[in-house]
Amino acid sequence: MAEPASVAAESLAGSRARAARTVLGQVVLPGEELLLPEQEDAEGPGGAVERPLSLNARACSRVRVVCGPGLRRCGDRLLVTKCGRLRHKEPGSGSGGGVYWVDSQQKRYVPVKGDHVIGIVTAKSGDIFKVDVGGSEPASLSYLSFEGATKRNRPNVQVGDLIYGQFVVANKDMEPEMVCIDSCGRANGMGVIGQDGLLFKVTLGLIRKLLAPDCEIIQEVGKLYPLEIVFGMNGRIWVKAKTIQQTLILANILEACEHMTSDQRKQIFSRLAES
Amino acid sequence: MEEETHTDAKIRAENGTGSSPRGPGCSLRHFACEQNLLSRPDGSASFLQGDTSVLAGVYGPAEVKVSKEIFNKATLEVILRPKIGLPGVAEKSRERLIRNTCEAVVLGTLHPRTSITVVLQVVSDAGSLLACCLNAACMALVDAGVPMRALFCGVACALDSDGTLVLDPTSKQEKEARAVLTFALDSVERKLLMSSTKGLYSDTEQCLAAAQAASQHVFRFYRESLQRRYSKS
């Protein structure tokens, strides 16, 4: 039947692959395909352009593009798998076409190698601690992965303690493993988080925003009260201020930051600074 | 404080011309969608089609019981709760249809040995319930950030005793219809993912074509709704 076919063709036309460059900063939906820069010329308008064959068969100059979170390779195109804004980072130096990724808002954490996270010790079995990091599996932490830990000198870690560490093994096939030392054997701020303070959960997007360089929120919060703060990439934040009231105020501000514009934030900070 | 994105859209799908007889009631009802309204689940959405409303929550990728884990992909579970009474056989069969649709679309191989649970609660049922459940499930999965290879939507249509096709039927239209067909279509090429049919009918092609045309509007609504959500951040 002619009618449904024309309707179908019209709907399919909207889903042709677009060049990644043109979609930067826009919201992309799962299922969209993006063309990498070197393929745009090949596709061309209409796609059936005749090209004279070059006798000097040079290998097509492939630019190495890194596919970040939210994107998958699908043939020689990028398939969007999460909804969010498409971002691109130019390569700092050397070759490569940079990194493309989708900035999405999520609450659930999936362990990634190298991420610094806050975990809660849930079990102690032999030489391994089981640490809940908010993912699908508890991570394992060996007692030797603390600074200055030896078989005789065991670290003082109890069930229920908060641990700040980083992942050394985190992929979809294996149980995640974390450590509290860096590659040189130094703690570098990691380890058991001290007494008191408050642990609360926020979305992953907010953490990334707060950890971005030159984040105004952190600078303003630092001017309010003296505080200790630890950010985990798994959406957990630990704060400690002099009094419980100050700690709670800080926790509320950080949780609310996500939905406030910078003007509203400045108002609240100035009101708090006065009182 | 919760971020709520309430998007209203009045969508009309007029399939006026064509060789098949189309009645005046060939338009989709008023749509509305709200995301991230529940604080506990990783993703949640409420989808409204006319007076039919379904609330969906997604948990995942989360821990899975050893008896239910699959070694190379995520275990997808769908729980559908009716508005009143205990879930029965009809709910079980709908859960299975929704689960099969979601499994075709969700990239489960990225999260092996985990579980992704979709919980659907019927808030009000005024026709096209399965289609509304599918739409709510899709929006909730997107809200939770579960990796998917495409979006999907559900479109229901009812065939009258004189062959008139009505899209998005109300409960009254469903009761009086000769056949009720529900299709789940994917967003990339409008391919058929799932179909659930009840009654006497002879021409699936016509209904499928009408559903594919209507799904265009649903996907456009999804896009607008998600763009509005991300424009606020």
From Swiss-Prot, chain A:
GO terms for biological process, alphabetical: CUT catabolic process; DNA deamination; exonucleolytic trimming to generate mature 3'-end of 5.8S rRNA from tricistronic rRNA transcript (SSU-rRNA, 5.8S rRNA, LSU-rRNA); isotype switching; mRNA catabolic process; nuclear polyadenylation-dependent rRNA catabolic process; nuclear-transcribed mRNA catabolic process; poly(A)-dependent snoRNA 3'-end processing
Keywords noted in UniProt: Acetylation, Cytoplasm, Disease variant, Exosome, Isopeptide bond, Neurodegeneration, Nucleus, RNA-binding, rRNA processing, Ubl conjugation
N-acetylalanine modified-residue sites: A2
Gene Ontology molecular function, alphabetical: 3'-5'-RNA exonuclease activity; RNA binding
Cross-link Glycyl lysine isopeptide (Lys-Gly) (interchain with G-Cter in SUMO2) placement: K151
Assembly with partners or alone: Component of the RNA exosome core complex (Exo-9), composed of EXOSC1, EXOSC2, EXOSC3, EXOSC4, EXOSC5, EXOSC6, EXOSC7, EXOSC8 and EXOSC9; within the complex interacts with EXOSC5 and EXOSC9. The catalytically inactive RNA exosome core complex (Exo-9) associates with the catalytic subunit EXOSC10/RRP6. Exo-9 may associate with DIS3 to form the nucleolar exosome complex, or DIS3L to form the cytoplasmic exosome complex. Exo-9 is formed by a hexameric base ring consisting of the heterodimers EXOSC4-EXOSC9, EXOSC5-EXOSC8 and EXOSC6-EXOSC7, and a cap ring consisting of EXOSC1, EXOSC2 and EXOSC3.
Disease: Pontocerebellar hypoplasia 1B: A severe autosomal recessive neurologic disorder characterized by a combination of cerebellar and spinal motor neuron degeneration beginning at birth. There is diffuse muscle weakness, progressive microcephaly, global developmental delay, and brainstem involvement.
Protein family: Belongs to the RRP40 family.
Function summary: Non-catalytic component of the RNA exosome complex which has 3'->5' exoribonuclease activity and participates in a multitude of cellular RNA processing and degradation events. In the nucleus, the RNA exosome complex is involved in proper maturation of stable RNA species such as rRNA, snRNA and snoRNA, in the elimination of RNA processing by-products and non-coding 'pervasive' transcripts, such as antisense RNA species and promoter-upstream transcripts (PROMPTs), and of mRNAs with processing defects, thereby limiting or excluding their export to the cytoplasm.
Name listed for the protein in its UniProt record: Exosome complex component RRP40
Lineage: Eukaryota, Metazoa, Chordata, Craniata, Vertebrata
Gene (name only): EXOSC3
